[in-house]
Amino acid sequence: MSCQGTVSPKGARKLHDADVVYLYDGSFEGFLCCVYESFAQHELPFAVWTPQRETATLYPVKDIATDPAVARRVFASFGKKLGAETEYLVSRDFLSGQEDKELLLLRFLHLAFALGPGTVKREGHPVVAPLYAMKKSLDWEVDKFQGFVRFEEHDGMLGAVIHPKNYILPLLRPHFCGRFPEEDFMIYDAVHQAVLLHEGHKTQLLELAAPLELPPPSAREQQFQALWTQFYKTLEIKARHNEKGRMTPVSYTHLRAHETSL
């Protein structure tokens, strides 16, 4: 493993590649404790795993305990020493679904603390560029799901299942809570086994221990699906028929606005 682009301030111990694997609980606080350990030991681990990604290895595994007090100090140092832009980018990129995101973030943080707050603007640097690639993937997916989430009705609650590459529920929360403040709804992320639940004007992000199965659609949803079929056939222009385009998810939130006029 290479620490390409990582430098140490004058007089500081040089960062070295360590034949060790960090194992943490997968939380952002846990990752911040990994950052603390990496800086304390002046080492870049071979890998950073969560229990879900743990596998057989010949390298020693170092369990990194989650300490909220340590996590708060580390996070505070981002804004204080590196600036709000770096704090935002690191926090957002942690939601990425990229498997080696922790190592990419660690490399960047070592570089940023060595060079200062302007590091985040060096988008072409080989250590910085991967963070913008992760952000681009997140931004694209958030924009996609804000416009195309397929809701179905289940006993008075709107339900939707999504399969995003990245963990975007926290980023979707402001959009859907603002769009449907009076509705009870649930968005289930089947990839990350998490739920965004908005019920009784209260919103929660829940992590599930087991996969969730939604019940069959209600009669109203079946009627709504039939209404969409009629809507599609009415607007379809045969000369421009595109079967692949038909397979694209339909924005049910947009269609609901037209339900009474069809």
Which ranges hold each PLM region?
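N-terminal ordered "arm"
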Residues: 3, 7-68
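Glycine- and acidic
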Residues: 17-21, 158, 213
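Charged, alpha-helical interface segments at or near domain boundaries
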Residues: 59-142
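Internal, well-folded beta-alpha domain core
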Residues: 118-208
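Conserved small/polar residues in nucleotide/adenosyl-binding loops
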Residues: 253-260
